[in-house]
Regions:
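Short beta-strand elements of ligand-binding domains
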Residues: 95-98, 124-130, 248, 275-280
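Small/aliphatic-rich secondary-structure junction motif
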Residues: 1-48, 65, 139-194, 209-219, ...
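Glycine-rich, Arg-bearing micro-motifs that act as flexible, cationic patches
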Residues: 96-115, 119, 136-138, 244-270
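Structural beta-alpha unit
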Residues: 24, 41-43, 51, 58-94, ...
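Conserved acidic residues
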Residues: 3, 91-92, 121, 139, ...
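Short, solvent-exposed amphipathic alpha-helices that sit
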Residues: 18-21, 48-56, 81, 196-207, ...
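Active-site phosphate/pyrophosphate- and oxyanion-stabilizing loops and adjacent acidic/basic residues
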Residues: 23, 114, 157, 206, ...
């Protein structure tokens, strides 16, 4: 089964912006396949969907992509209907939006995108678009890494689809130290911990170069100690001038009811650049 990009389109202008990412990522697949799905849940008239789908179809013709446009009735909830319409497993890379919900519910908590990320049925990338003028083509990316022994494997499908050979990729390891403890670390201890972070990032960089047919020509490593994980990611993103942050999601890290204290929600809320939250099946 050929890999494909699946765009979950809710009929909004935000989904049109996410579509730019979907088009560019589909162009990087061998089969160049894009599937666009809208579920008729009553929030958007069918008449509003038709011109948006027509615009995507024209872009697919222009880019030489194989495009499938689907409008499906609602069965159960929107997330379940979307999952039923797409091929399950690692062959599908589902893109959806992450935009602020009504009544201060946050960007992911309680949304269709959160349920897709939690589903575990396919690769999912929820994108918050801050700079639509990038047209889904960020040139500088920041990948914060948690130091998991599996290295970069969970992020690799998204790296291969997003990072062009001319892109600048920043690998970031933020090692969290408590506020009180951070101020009392000796210089030698701090250097030793940072060295461990750089060792981990070196292994990840080697893995990227080994697996990518055309790895990014600029691959840089950054290891820091900080008391505030989310805050440090935002600081580093600003300092490095990145155009997109990619963050891995887990069942534990995804917001459900708690919004304001959740680090993913905080980054989505305070970011000055595009953000992608990814999860693999």
């Amino acid at each position: 089964m050929e890999q494909r990009i699946v765009l979950a389109h809710d009929g909004s202008i935000n989904a049109d912006w996410v579509a730019r990412y979907a088009l560019r990522m589909a162009a990087g697949l061998p089969g160049r396949r894009l599937q666009v799905i809208h579920i008729l849940d009553g929030s958007v008239d069918r008449d509003r969907i038709a011109p948006r789908f027509a615009a995507i179809a024209r872009e697919c013709v222009r880019e030489g992509l194989h495009c499938e446009l689907l409008i499906r009735d609602l069965h159960g909830d929107v997330a379940a209907s979307l999952l039923a319409a797409m091929q399950p497993g690692a062959v599908s890379h589902c893109l959806c939006g992450a935009r602020v919900a009504a009544r201060g519910r946050g960007f992911l908590a309680g949304t269709v995108s959160e349920r897709l990320l939690r589903s575990g049925q396919c690769n999912v990338l929820a994108v918050r678009v801050v700079s639509p003028g990038l047209l889904g083509c960020p040139r500088t990316l920041l990948f914060p890494l948690a130091g998991h022994p599996r290295g970069f494997r969970s992020a690799m499908p998204f790296l291969l689809l997003l990072a062009q050979p001319t892109a600048r990729l920043h690998l970031l390891r933020v090692m969290v130290v408590g506020h009180l403890h951070l101020g009392h670390l000796s210089a030698a201890t701090a250097r030793a911990r940072i060295a461990l972070g750089y060792d981990y990032l070196t292994r990840v960089a080697d893995e990227i170069r080994a697996q990518a047919d055309a790895p990014p020509c600029h691959l840089e490593r950054h290891a820091v100690l900080a008391a505030d994980w989310a805050g440090e990611i935002l600081v580093q993103a600003g300092k490095l001038g990145v155009q997109m942050i990619l963050l891995g999601a887990s069942e534990r890290s995804l917001p459900h009811r708690v919004v304001y204290g959740n680090p993913l929600e905080r980054i989505l809320r305070d970011t000055a650049c595009d953000v992608g939250i990814y999860c693999r099946p």
